[in-house]
């Protein structure tokens, strides 16, 4: 029993030392997203791939946006333009962009 309590106390101490997940800064994200509006801000815009319609990303779930941008950054999602853009962002900047976009109303 004493060993279990010791292990539990050690685990609790270790977990409390972990950094909290960083919350993105929506104002910084708004500035970072400025270049993204060239594609994501135009209604019915189609990029170099005529069959690919660029999605509106405002109002998306913050966790989804972080996962998607991180996936492009790591090469797990394939789209040359998005991979190039995402590779230029730090994890903090991705969190900032996601915070900004998730604060918007979804596009109609």
Regions picked out by a protein language model, each given a short descriptive name:
Residues 54-62, 84-94:
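Electron-transfer interface patches adjacent to heme c in soluble/periplasmic c-type cytochromes
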Residues 23-54, 71-81, 104-108:
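Periplasmic/extracellular electron-transfer cofactor-ligation site
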Residues 14-19:
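N-terminal signal peptide c-region/cleavage motif recognized by signal peptidases
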Residues 1-8:
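Bacterial N-terminal signal peptides that target proteins for export
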Residues 88, 92-106:
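C-terminal structural segments of small proteins and small subunits
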